[in-house]
UniProtKB/Swiss-Prot annotation:
Protein family according to the UniProt entry: Belongs to the MTB12 family.
The keyword Amino-acid biosynthesis appears for this protein: no
Protein name, as recorded: Putative lipoprotein LppK
Cellular compartment(s): Cell membrane
Region (Disordered): 174-194
Length: 194
C-alpha cells in the first residue's frame, strides 16, 4: 500500500470513531408502560420511530470478530466476503480484495480483533454497536480501538454482518477503486510585498 493509501486507511478509521462517537452519545432507554388514556400516545402526522430491540440476545463477541477476521483475510476471495457486509454487491469484491491485500502487503497481518461494549444500536434497534480493538502485526501503534456497527443477516440465517454504514466508512465502497487519493496539496500563492 502506498503512503497515501496508508494515510487514507487511518483517516477512514478516524471517521468511524468520530461518527460512531457522536451517533451513540446521549442515548437513554426509558421504561415504557401501557396505560389506557383518552390522550393518544402520538399526535396525528407524527410517527414514533422508536422500536424495541429484538427478543434475541446480543451476539457473542467472537461472532462479530469472526466477521472482521474473515474480511481481513487475503486468502478468502472478495466474492466470498460479500455476505459479510450488508448490501454488498459483486462490484464490492474488488474493493474487498484490495483492502485485505493492502493489509497483507503493508505488514498489518496477522491482525486480531476483540469486541467489547456490545449494545443495541440507538439508530437501528436490530443492529448492534461494539467497540472493536484491533491488534496489528506492526510494533508502532499496534493496537487501536473504534466503534463498529453490525447488522443481522436477513432471516432465516442467524448470524451477523458489518453494517453498510461502517463498511462504507472503513472500506470506501463509494469509490470505484475502493481507495481514495488525497486531494493534491497546493503550495500557497506568494503575496507580493509592498
Amino acid at each position: 500500500m502506498s503512503r497515501w493509501t496508508h494515510r487514507t486507511f487511518f483517516i477512514a478509521l478516524s471517521a468511524i470513531v468520530t461518527t460512531a462517537g457522536f451517533g451513540s452519545s446521549g442515548c437513554a432507554h426509558g421504561n415504557s408502560s401501557t396505560s389506557e388514556s383518552a390522550v393518544p400516545s402520538t399526535f396525528p402526522g407524527i410517527s414514533s420511530s422508536i422500536t424495541a430491540p429484538p427478543a434475541t440476545g446480543l451476539p457473542a463477541p467472537e461472532v462479530l470478530t469472526n466477521v472482521l477476521s474473515r474480511l481481513a483475510d487475503p486468502n478468502i476471495p472478495g466474492i466470498d466476503k460479500l455476505p459479510l457486509i450488508e448490501s454488498a454487491t459483486p462490484d464490492s469484491a474488488v474493493t474487498l480484495d484490495k483492502f485485505s491485500n493492502a493489509l497483507r502487503d503493508n505488514g498489518y497481518l496477522p491482525m486480531t480483533f476483540t469486541a467489547n461494549n456490545i449494545a443495541w444500536s440507538n439508530k437501528n434497534p436490530s443492529d448492534v454497536l461494539a467497540t472493536i480493538s484491533v491488534n496489528i502485526a506492526q510494533t508502532n501503534n499496534s493496537v487501536f480501538s473504534f466503534p463498529m456497527e453490525f447488522t443481522p443477516f436477513p432471516p432465516p440465517q442467524q448470524s451477523w454482518q458489518l453494517s453498510k454504514r461502517t463498511a462504507d466508512m472503513l472500506l470506501e465502497f463509494g469509490n470505484s477503486s475502493g481507495l481514495t487519493n488525497p486531494a493534491p496539496i497546493k503550495a500557497p500563492t506568494p503575496t507580493p510585498s509592498h
